[in-house]
Amino acid sequence: MTSRYNSVLTVQDLHFSYNSHPVLSAIDFGVEAGELLAILGPNGVGKTTLLKCINAIFKPKGGCVLLEGRSVLELRSAEIATRIGYVAQKSETSRFTVFDAVLMGRMPHVRWKIGNHDLKIVDAALRRLGLTHLQLRYIDQISGGELQKVALARALVQEPGLLLLDEPTSSLDLRNQIAILTLLRRVVDEHGIAGIMTMHDLNTALRFAHKFLLLKDGAVFATGRVEELTGDMVAEVYGLRVDIHSIGGYPIVVPMDCDTNHPHPGHTAEPHDHTP
């Protein structure tokens, strides 16, 4: 199947159901190199499920996910690991040190043994994310925010062409949220990586993403550049009247009050223990 997009990632007519319960339907979009896309929508709308379909953790019931023109279902797991960096919303803890946990991201690239090149890449990622002082600590001894940084560092050392991040700043304070997303945007811009992040905070998403994908009832309601998001779109999806202003060149969503003409949309339940 040929792609309708000149994209690193192309999602075409994707459908996913858990047992007989539809979660996603007719999802179409593409992400190009050097673009950061924010997937937005209410709780339970299917954002995490979509990321897991892209990463071949879940197999769609219909449609396809193409990575540079190839179906992800045709790729071996080792190849996916070198081409897609995935940061889950909740990272597992273990008795790895921070250094070893980040080094695990290099494993898909290692042929015989870990070399100096791999160690330098890990050192650079630890410095970029402010983790050097924690590198000998066990990851079950660090905070949730620090654990999110470790997960991002591990994804970055994979040197992927596509980054998938599920609520990458959910456990971070405001200062660290800004620092991490500034770094993420810089990596995408400077290295030509395609990035996708799911977000609940609209203002943070609009501040750092190039484009948005707004989901409602498991389908694409609207997509475009962040400056194209309108108050009517937000009201329809979230059931909340808002004004959107430009401050410092960035769109800012200002909630007004709940719109009784747009009640909060119903959720699509996502699989237990397989999605958040």
Predicted regions and their residues:
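The feature captures the beta-strand-to-loop junction immediately N-terminal to the Walker
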Residues: 40-42
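Helix-to-loop junction immediately C-terminal to a conserved catalytic motif
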Residues: 55
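Catalytic Walker B motif of ABC-type/P-loop ATPase nucleotide-binding domains
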Residues: 163-167
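Conserved ABC transporter NBD signature motif
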Residues: 63-71, 80
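ABC ATPase nucleotide-binding domains
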Residues: 237-276
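Conserved ABC ATPase "signature" region
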Residues: 103, 116-134
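Conserved ABC ATPase signature
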Residues: 138-142, 146
